[in-house]
Regions:
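Enzymes that bind and transform nitrogen-containing heteroaromatic metabolites
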Residues: 1-142
Length: 142
């Protein structure tokens, strides 16, 4: 989470309603929030403010016209899948474990379309139950 916090601070985060619900009504500090939902009402507030858009295209349009902040798509699975078409850079955390009965997954990525910029491995330790790798990719120019 420290990497997520450092990376997204000062940016705009776009997420689906279920991901937003997982925040338990908290607004993450130092970030603009856009929630993609057809059920939330525009302008609702819970411990801060956020914008509601009905689809990813309108969320991206709002983010691009309202600020020059970097934009991060932070989930869930269907928002990730749809957002991959627009992504210029990927920040992936690969955790070296198998989760039994998992129901949500990051979509498959064709890495032949991307340049690996960095891969930083971390061992399991007292703070991390499993080893993991932080990976950064940039989209290849066509």
């Amino acid at each position: 989470l420290a990497m997520f916090k450092a990376l997204t601070a000062g940016g705009t985060i776009i997420m689906g309603r279920k991901t937003f619900d997982s925040f338990n009504g908290r607004i993450l500090p130092h970030r603009d929030h856009i929630v993609i939902s057809r059920t939330l009402k525009k302008g609702m507030k819970q411990s801060g403010s956020y914008r509601v858009c009905s689809d990813l295209d309108s969320a991206l349009q709002h983010a691009l016209t309202e600020s020059f902040n970097p934009i991060f798509i932070i989930g869930g699975a269907s928002i990730y899948k749809e957002g991959l078409r627009e992504a210029k850079k990927l920040y992936l955390t690969r955790v070296d474990t198998v989760v039994e009965n998992a129901t949500a997954f990051f979509p498959e990525v064709d890495l032949s379309e991307w340049h690996a910029v960095s891969k930083i491995p971390f061992p399991a330790d007292e703070k991390h139950q499993f080893p993991f790798t932080l990976e950064t990719y940039v989209r290849k120019l066509v």
